[in-house]
């Protein structure tokens, strides 16, 4: 029997992404200043500081460890699933439409991004753009974005794209071309509220449906080693 012991630290003391400490320090300093000026203002200041800590949380994930599994690189809601043409800058091989899974992250979701599958980083492409609402389909082509193409073996590739949104104005990618990565490995962050698109290899079927909640590094989006058909969802 395999067992996971859940401790209180798992929920009350999550790790903080390094990107967050600067913002947490600023919020805390402003809160202290407000307390010196008008003591009642410490309450909204504390609320915002705690929210900042919550936003930049970086909890440990239990990553499904089996060859062929593709996990979601972002926490949030599966917004769109369908066959589309990937952005031209990806130059995927073979060219043509692919199944795209779009995950939208609200300001309340964990914004630490993870690699959806193990492989080698073949290409990283940054594209400047607009900051329209990330829930719109056109955001994948119009918005500022950072794209990563992974070689995943057997002459296959997979791409995922960090997309800025209406509020999100900062994309961070810690990967470099030629780097080997593991499934679920931390690769970056987007602040504050945004979207992440995953382009599956040809023939792969999505195993999630629009409206489904997902957890970065844990929720399985596809199984490249299985012939299971695409899953559909029903709202109940």
From Swiss-Prot:
Highest taxon of the lineage: Bacteria
Keyword entries, A-Z: Cell membrane, Decarboxylase, Lipid biosynthesis, Lipid metabolism, Lyase, Membrane, Phospholipid biosynthesis, Phospholipid metabolism, Pyruvate, Zymogen
GO cellular component: plasma membrane
Catalytic activity: a 1,2-diacyl-sn-glycero-3-phospho-L-serine + H(+) = a 1,2-diacyl-sn-glycero-3-phosphoethanolamine + CO2
Pfam families from the UniProt entry: PS_Dcarbxylase (PF02666)
Pathway stated in the Swiss-Prot or TrEMBL entry: Phospholipid metabolism; phosphatidylethanolamine biosynthesis; phosphatidylethanolamine from CDP-diacylglycerol: step 2/2
EC number(s) on file: 4.1.1.65
Predominant subcellular localization, coarse grouping: membrane
Gene Ontology annotations of biological process type: phosphatidylethanolamine biosynthetic process
Stored HAMAP family: PS_decarb_PSD_A (MF_00664)
PANTHER family to which the protein is assigned, alphabetical: ARCHAETIDYLSERINE DECARBOXYLASE PROENZYME-RELATED
UniProt-recorded name of the protein: Phosphatidylserine decarboxylase proenzyme
